[in-house]
Amino acid sequence: LALPAVSQVIQDGLAFDAVVALNDRAAIGALAAIKENQLAMPISIYGIDGSPDMKVLLSTTDDIEGTVAQSPLKMGRQVMQVIECMRTGKSYKEQYKIPVEMIDKDNVDRYDVNGWQ
């Protein structure tokens, strides 16, 4: 979805110097649109997911600035704890904060490029 949307923005002549995408796939689509339309870099591109593809791009090119890694495992564990509280009638909080991590060129080597964070 990002490739045609970003292509349209470029063709409409709207100037931009950054893309913050909904997820890593969209960030990669935005990058493809920028390259396909031969827009001059640098344009800062960020994604969300900590996907293997984004980590490879981070470690091998200057095209991507970063990705925010969420932890589906931590989220799932928290959800299961809340479900258990609901099931047993125990109290639980309305909101939970689950930390995320910014992965960029300075720290991508600390993450496995073959897996999700």
Located regions from the model:
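Short beta-strand elements at the ligand-binding edges of bilobed clamshell
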Residues: 60-73
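Structural detector of well-ordered beta-strand residues that form the stable sheet scaffold
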Residues: 44-46, 65-68, 103
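Short, well-ordered alpha-helices that flank and scaffold nucleotide-derived cofactor binding pockets
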Residues: 32-36, 60, 81, 85
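Hinge/cleft segment of the Venus flytrap/periplasmic-binding protein
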Residues: 50, 71-117
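Short glycine-centered helix-capping/turn motifs at secondary-structure transition points
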Residues: 37-38, 62, 115
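Generic structural signal for alpha-helix termini and adjacent loop/cap motifs
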Residues: 12, 61, 86-90
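Hydrophobic alpha-helical
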Residues: 1-55
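Extracellular/periplasmic bilobal clamshell ligand-binding domains
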Residues: 54-57, 87
